[in-house]
C-alpha cells in the first residue's frame, strides 16, 4: 500500500520499528499508525503477564506532505487495553513526558529525513511541550 505521501507503507513500518519498541503493527490501519510506551510499572508484585503500566499512546496519520499526531497518557491494564486516566504522581508524569519527548524527537528526525513534517492533529491540544 502506498500512503498519500507516495511512500510505501511497508517501508515506513520498517523504519518506525527501527525507532524502538513503540509501534503496534496490529493496530495500524490504512494511513494510520499506532505507537505506545509502557513507561512505569504500577506494581511489580504480580506475574509479568498480569502487570499494569502507566504510559502513553500516540496515533499518527499519514497525509500528503505531513504526518499528524495525537497522544494520551493513561493506564495499560492486564488485559492489554489502554484507558485514559489522570495520573497524580509527579515522578510518573515526568517519566511519561520524558519518554514521549524522546520518541517524538526520533520520529520527527525520521520524518524530516523523508521530507515530511510532523504536526499535531488539527483538533489536538498538545498538553506536553514536545519541542523547544
From Swiss-Prot:
Short name of one Pfam family: Crl
GO cellular component: cytoplasm
Gene3D superfamilies assigned: Sigma factor-binding protein Crl monomer
Keywords of the record: Activator, Coiled coil, Cytoplasm, Transcription, Transcription regulation
Region listing for Essential for activity, in residue ranges: 99-122
Predominant location category: cytoplasm
Keyword Coiled coil among UniProt keywords: yes
Subcellular location(s) per record: Cytoplasm
UniProt family annotation: Belongs to the Crl family.
NCBIfam families: PRK10984.1
Function recorded in the entry: Binds to the sigma-S subunit of RNA polymerase, activating expression of sigma-S-regulated genes. Stimulates RNA polymerase holoenzyme formation and may bind to several other sigma factors, such as sigma-70 and sigma-32.
Name of this chain's protein: Sigma factor-binding protein Crl
Organism: Citrobacter koseri (strain ATCC BAA-895 / CDC 4225-83 / SGSC4696)
Protein encoded by which gene: crl
Amino acid at each position: 500500500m502506498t500512503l498519500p505521501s507516495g511512500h510505501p507503507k511497508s517501508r515506513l513500518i520498517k523504519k518506525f520499528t527501527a525507532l524502538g519498541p513503540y509501534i503496534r503493527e496490529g493496530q495500524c490501519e490504512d494511513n494510520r499508525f499506532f505507537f505506545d510506551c509502557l513507561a512505569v510499572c504500577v506494581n511489580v508484585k504480580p506475574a509479568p503477564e498480569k502487570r499494569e503500566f502507566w504510559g502513553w499512546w500516540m496515533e499518527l496519520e499519514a497525509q500528503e506532505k505531513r504526518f499528524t499526531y495525537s497522544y494520551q497518557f493513561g493506564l495499560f491494564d492486564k488485559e492489554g487495553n489502554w484507558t485514559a486516566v489522570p495520573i497524580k504522581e509527579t515522578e510518573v508524569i515526568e517519566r511519561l513526558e520524558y519518554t514521549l519527548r524522546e520518541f517524538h524527537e526520533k520520529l520527527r528526525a525520521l520524518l524530516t529525513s523523508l521530507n515530511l513534517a510532523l504536526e499535531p492533529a488539527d483538533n489536538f491540544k498538545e498538553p506536553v511541550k514536545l519541542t523547544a
